[in-house]
Structure formats: structure tokens, C-alpha cells
Amino acid sequence: AATAFGSDPRVWGEVDRPCRTVAILGGSLGDFGELAIAAGADVVVTGEAGYHVAQDLALRGLPVILLGHDRSEEPFVDILMNSAVDAGVDPRHAIKILNPCQWWTVTKGENL
């Protein structure tokens, strides 16, 4: 996740466990962690989640990777831009603006 999104994610749960099924939810996890468990996910990757939600899921065996709300939505920017152009928006007016910074401080050795 760190390499793919160019950020230092926060990780809740076991970082070295095997992973076959990844649940991905852009933006905020909200209450969708239960759906990830029901779907058999080995990990959930999302933008943000409440402290107790992430803690609860990790304790129940579902690691949570938090990328940052903005970073988790970046993969969808091209899809939205292409849809706008397909709908008739002049490509010169479809401008992609990505956030070049990370909004939280990284503390090396942080154990959540």
C-alpha cells in the first residue's frame, strides 16, 4: 500500500499474516468492516476509520490499512475524468488535481 499510494499507511492488526482476499473501500470505512468480514476478506484497505472500529476489527482478526481519505480515492479520479469527457466535457477542462502531501505525522515504530 505504501508503494502503490506513495504514503505511509497506518496499519492495525497483524502485518505479517498471509493475505489472499483484500476488501477495498475508498474514503471512510464507516460500518462496512462487517461486510468485509462476511465476504471473507483477509485485510481491508480504506482511507480512514474510527479508532474503535479499526481496533475492534483488528482484534477480531481483520487487519485494517488506513491510507488517508484522499489517497484512497485517487484511483477513481481517472475513471471520473474519463466519464466526464465521455459525457461531452472538453478534455482541456477536465483537470486532475492530486494532493502531494500526507496529512498525518508518521512516527517510526508506532504500534497501533
Where are the predicted features?
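Hydrophobic structural segments
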Residues: A1-L112
